[in-house]
């Protein structure tokens, strides 16, 4: 049987290679099946570590914990990551969203367990510890409790405070990531056994530090999604109740006097077959209404004739005007016009006789 360390390493490797980075869709049966089996393995491993083997105790410090056991403090962190990816395959959308809400809340609980465990061992970053202390109900935190809020509702500095805290977390996370990378390189190039154990212990502690900062981001994302799903489910229930009430009203018989509490249909015809008026109406010029909408918002087709369009273009000065005068049609019965054309032809003949072809510009060739 594999040791606890081997089981833990196998689960983390499986998460990194096939669950965190995968070509499968998260809602596919293959992915969810692998995810569920991994969660079960990690839960069994957690029971073995904390209950059966009792590797951790509330009356000890981190110095009392062996180097090989330090990484097991991140079990709840990985549980939170895995559970947040769970999805239901129910065909009903509301039921599917309801199950997702449950999974997200379970994920937040696992993240809180992880932070609480680090706090017990005095390993929690002060920024993270401050946020953990702001939760009124630690295992049921609200999105508004993650960041400092102004005392006065009229104070508009809430966004500025949130931005400031986010920048602090980001810079702190970046600093820890750099130290973690340096430790990994140093451990890889170190060959001495004594220094190797110290570097490995420091690496495990720095990794837990990095996980605690990342946990805040995961909690924020989960709470934001929980808020969206809660609003979605509330609206769905309200719509179902409204539609049920409407159906019950429609199923009741109409009043004998003809009274009804149903809303009138806008598309109801004006008159029935007998000529009786069914609803109030106002005589309007429909063509004029459509014409006014042509240049407004929305996609309306043209509702004017070509002549109207050209008149409008002329009014707005979009039509180019001017140019040469059009030639008048020749009037062969006009004697003056015939004389002018005759003289013009004679002049052209005389010009051609006095100017031989090719006698123009000879380009200095003689």
Curated annotation (Swiss-Prot):
Region called Disordered, residue ranges: 318-366
Keyword terms of this UniProt record: Phosphoprotein, Signal transduction inhibitor
Family from the record: Belongs to the IGBP1/TAP42 family.
Organism: Saccharomyces cerevisiae (strain ATCC 204508 / S288c)
Ranges annotated as biased composition (Basic and acidic residues): 337-356
PANTHER family with a match to the protein in the record: IMMUNOGLOBULIN-BINDING PROTEIN 1 (PTHR10933:SF9)
Keyword Membrane found: no
Subunit organization: Associates with the PP2a (PPH21 and PPH22) and SIT4 protein phosphatase catalytic subunits. Interacts with PPG1, PPH3 and TIP41.
GO molecular function ontology, one term from the record: protein phosphatase 2A binding
Post-translation changes: Phosphorylated by TOR kinases. Dephosphorylated by CDC55, TPD3 and SIT4.
Protein's recorded name: Type 2A phosphatase-associated protein 42
Gene field: TAP42
Single GO biological process annotation from the record: regulation of TORC1 signaling
Record field: compositional bias (Acidic residues): 324-336
Keyword Phosphoprotein part of the UniProt annotation: yes
Top-rank taxon: Eukaryota
Functional description taken from the UniProt entry: Involved in negative regulation of the TOR signaling pathway in response to type of available nitrogen source. Inhibitor of PP2A phosphatase SIT4, which results in inhibition of nuclear export of MSN2, due to lack of dephosphorylation by SIT4. Also required for rapamycin induced activation of expression of many nitrogen discrimination pathway (NDP) genes. In complex with PPH21, required for organization of the actin cytoskeletom during the cell cycle via a Rho GTPase-dependent mechanism.
Pfam families: TAP42
GO cellular component, one term: protein phosphatase type 2A complex
